[in-house]
Amino acid sequence: MKKTNDNYHSARFVMSAPNIHHLPPDQGMEVAFAGRSNAGKSSALNTLTQQKNLAKISKTPGRTQLINLFEVAEGIRLVDLPGYGYAAVPLAIKIKWQKALNEYLNKRDCLRGLVILMDIRHPLKNLDQQMIVWAINKRIPVYLLLTKVDKLSRSASKIQLDMVKEAILPFMGDIEVDVFSSLKKIGIDKLQNKLNAWFSGSVNE
């Protein structure tokens, strides 16, 4: 397989789907991006692909209501999952999102890894930890990105990073954590390397 780090900038939007029943066939490889509303998922995807408008960014938390697919190369996709944890979303919609999220995570066999984005100032909220536990139980590798690191000083960022590293030890799974900033392009190379490693496996036919 061609190195995908040469292809991220060529990523293209494929579709938005309300649930897995509207997604393409469960083939190839996908890496999903998850996180609380306003954790910076869309910004991270745009930075990764060097396309500022690939994933729509909104200042309104909870705007990502659908499963959004982006194709990097044939059979290789990035998935932007609905943001979770925004209290102002009506309960009926919240339940609908939760069902779509659960179905994708539990039934999508081509999922190769899960990137969970968390604001470095507010990491490891209950829903974040639930996502980690789910992934570990399913033996899905997890990459935690502490976003918006540019909002903190270097020393404060290190304190937060060390705290999260310590906190995830009890999870005992394939889980790593790094800092990230879409604004300052911090952590982009490490993210690319992680995705390349996940995508280097054999394609699920």
UniProtKB/Swiss-Prot annotation:
GO MF: GTP binding; metal ion binding
Annotated positions binding GTP: 35-42, 62-66, 80-83, 147-150, 180-182
PROSITE patterns: G_ENGB
Keyword Acetylation: no
Required cofactor names: Mg(2+)
GO BP annotations, alphabetical order: division septum assembly
Binding site for Mg(2+): S42, T64
PANTHER family reported for this sequence: ENGB-TYPE G DOMAIN-CONTAINING PROTEIN, MSS1/TRME-RELATED GTP-BINDING PROTEIN
HAMAP family membership: GTPase_EngB
Protein name: Probable GTP-binding protein EngB
Organism field: Hamiltonella defensa subsp. Acyrthosiphon pisum (strain 5AT)
